[in-house]
């Protein structure tokens, strides 16, 4: 039995895994970037406008000279989470992975925006608890189910109503709205520009961006 094999097997246990601390800290990366890093977690039903809002906020922040990245719910299913289904277990693991990636990107010094339904409150709180206090900002894109169904360009709600899609959030799987999000954006009442302004205003008030 080779030494390499022994190392690979014992390293699977947590007590044999060491954390290697980089000499280049997050604070130094933030200083180089010229701004603080953090995570904006957009959550809401399918059709609530999460992706559109996240990408538009990113564009505005980019124009202000910020280093940014959007983790989009559909995009990660093409690679990082392509092995996961849409069962409750699969969704939990999907959010866990995204939370870890978002945390790593924040450590790099980026402003990270995530656009995921992330239907379960406990999963979102688990991600929040992995972040330093104040670095996870939950933005609830609030909209009625009726409005989401009216916006349903993919036809997914219609398929879920017909029983062709199982465990679809809002139809036969619950969405647990945030209890104390940092911001609620009613995308049913507000225009896209008004929604973007609400996000930027929150960041400005917290000293996280200069408008």
Swiss-Prot record:
Keyword line: ATP-binding, Kinase, Nucleotide-binding, Phosphoprotein, Transferase
Database matches in InterPro entries: APS_kinase (IPR002891), P-loop_NTPase (IPR027417)
Pathway note: Sulfur metabolism; hydrogen sulfide biosynthesis; sulfite from sulfate: step 2/3
Catalytic machinery residues: 118 (phosphoserine intermediate)
Top-rank lineage group of the source organism: Bacteria
Catalysed reactions, semicolon-separated: adenosine 5'-phosphosulfate + ATP = 3'-phosphoadenylyl sulfate + ADP + H(+)
GO molecular function: adenylylsulfate kinase activity; ATP binding
EC number: 2.7.1.25
UniProt record, GO biological process: hydrogen sulfide biosynthetic process; sulfate assimilation
The protein's role, per its UniProt record: Catalyzes the synthesis of activated sulfate.
Family the UniProt entry places it in: Belongs to the APS kinase family.
Protein name: Adenylyl-sulfate kinase
Originating species: Thermosynechococcus vestitus (strain NIES-2133 / IAM M-273 / BP-1)
Gene (name only): cysC
């Amino acid at each position: 039995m080779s030494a390499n094999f022994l190392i690979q097997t014992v390293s699977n246990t947590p007590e044999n895994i060491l954390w290697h601390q980089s000499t280049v800290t997050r604070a130094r990366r933030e200083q180089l970037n010229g701004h603080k890093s953090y995570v904006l977690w957009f959550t809401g039903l399918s059709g609530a406008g999460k992706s559109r809002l996240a990408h538009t906020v990113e564009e505005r922040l980019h124009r202000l000279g910020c280093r940014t990245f959007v983790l989009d719910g559909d995009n990660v299913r093409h690679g990082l989470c392509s092995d996961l289904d849409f069962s409750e277990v699969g969704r939990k693991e999907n959010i866990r992975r995204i939370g870890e990636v978002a945390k790593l990107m924040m450590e790099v010094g980026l402003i990270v925006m995530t656009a995921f339904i992330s239907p379960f409150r406990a999963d979102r709180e688990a991600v929040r608890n992995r972040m330093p206090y104040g670095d996870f900002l939950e933005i609830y894109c609030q909209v009625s189910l009726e409005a989401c169904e009216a916006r349903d360009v993919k036809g997914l709600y219609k398929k879920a109503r017909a029983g062709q899609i199982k465990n679809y959030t809002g139809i036969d799987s619950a969405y647990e709205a945030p209890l104390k999000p940092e911001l609620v954006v009613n995308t049913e009442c507000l225009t896209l520009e008004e929604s973007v302004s609400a996000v930027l205003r929150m960041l400005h008030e917290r000293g996280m961006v200069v408008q």
